[in-house]
UniProtKB/Swiss-Prot annotation:
This is Probable endonuclease lcl3. Residues 1-34 are annotated as: Disordered. It is found in: Mitochondrion; Membrane. GO terms for molecular function: endonuclease activity; metal ion binding. Residues 20-34 have a biased composition (Basic and acidic residues).
Length: 291
């Protein structure tokens, strides 16, 4: 029936259908509001329950602990410049010696964690062997507390016993695992370190830990570092130990100390050699410019 009587039939139909739609919208809105409020209340209550909190705390702690362990113990340093200051005088680097450049420095491929972390037996943790693979991936180490005779380089002649020192250090360290206690970086982007090595055929005690700098001084293949600036021994006790080893080698006339007593005036230490070469190179350009 049309109502009001003067309304058309189409208008009456629209009027009759509006209330149910509005009623449905109101009903749907109230249902959605009640659903949202109930979901919110249930979620917050679940988060506060021990069965939710305990696994979350354990998982988060485990993740943070793993990150801390990896960053502190398993992080690999590709070169000396990447070593963080927190390692200086506190931590050590374990790695394999890939090359020996001179009588008192070498290259180390850092293998954090050693065999326990998979180095040497896991397929993806192999130490590279080719020069191409090792490029920009090794730490340049300078032995602390010692100065070895200089090999011929940069146009400078070879110093007596330089080849013997280089050969000895190569046979003693090359392809072996060593532990380097880092003291500080030097002006040549090297890490000055006290280095220890264990050798299976070490008489009389196999696998005894040996201080490489100390062994070189005993063999008479290096002198105690004499420079006024930049000398690093790793402490006063180590300096006394090194000077005592040098004194004994000098007394026995071992290695580069062989002719020290007979020809002390002309005998030249590695430090004196470097100083003389530096002075000659400084004077040479002036002479050439005058010509």
């Amino acid at each position: 029936m049309r109502w009001p009587p003067w309304a058309s039939e189409s208008q009456a139909q629209q009027h009759n259908t509006k209330p149910p739609i509005e009623h449905n919208e109101k009903e749907h809105g109230s249902k959605s509001k009640s659903w949202e409020s109930s979901v919110t209340a249930i979620d917050w209550a679940a988060f506060a329950e021990p069965r939710t909190i305990i696994p979350t705390v354990i998982l988060t702690s485990g993740f943070l602990g793993a990150f801390h362990i990896h960053r502190r113990y398993l992080r690999r340093f590709p070169d000396a410049g990447s070593i963080t200051p927190s390692h200086f005088r506190r931590r050590s680097l374990l790695g394999r010696v890939t090359s020996v450049g001179d009588g008192d420095n070498f290259r180390l491929y850092h293998t954090p964690g050693g065999r326990l972390a998979g180095w040497g037996w896991l397929p993806w943790k192999k130490v590279p062997t080719s020069k191409k693979e090792l490029r920009d991936k090794t730490v340049h180490i300078r032995l602390a507390g010692v100065d070895a005779p200089e090999l011929a380089h940069f146009g400078r002649p070879e110093q007596p016993f330089a080849r013997e020192a280089h050969q000895w250090l190569t046979s003693y360290l090359l392809n072996r695992r060593v532990r380097a206690y880092i003291h500080r970086p030097d002006q040549y982007q090297r890490a000055v370190a006290t280095v220890y090595v264990r050798r299976a055929l070490d008489f009389p005690i196999p696998f005894r830990r040996r201080d490489v700098s100390y062994e070189m001084l005993k063999q008479g293949l290096a002198t105690v570092y004499e420079a006024k600036w930049g000398a690093e021994f790793g402490g006063e006790a180590m300096e006394r130990k090194y000077r005592k080893a040098e004194w004994w080698a000098k007394l026995r006339g071992t290695g580069l100390w062989k002719d020290f007593r007979r020809n002390e005036k002309e005998w030249e230490s590695p430090r004196a050699y470097k100083t003389r070469m530096g002075l000659e190179e400084a004077v040479q350009p002036r002479v050439e410019s005058k010509k």
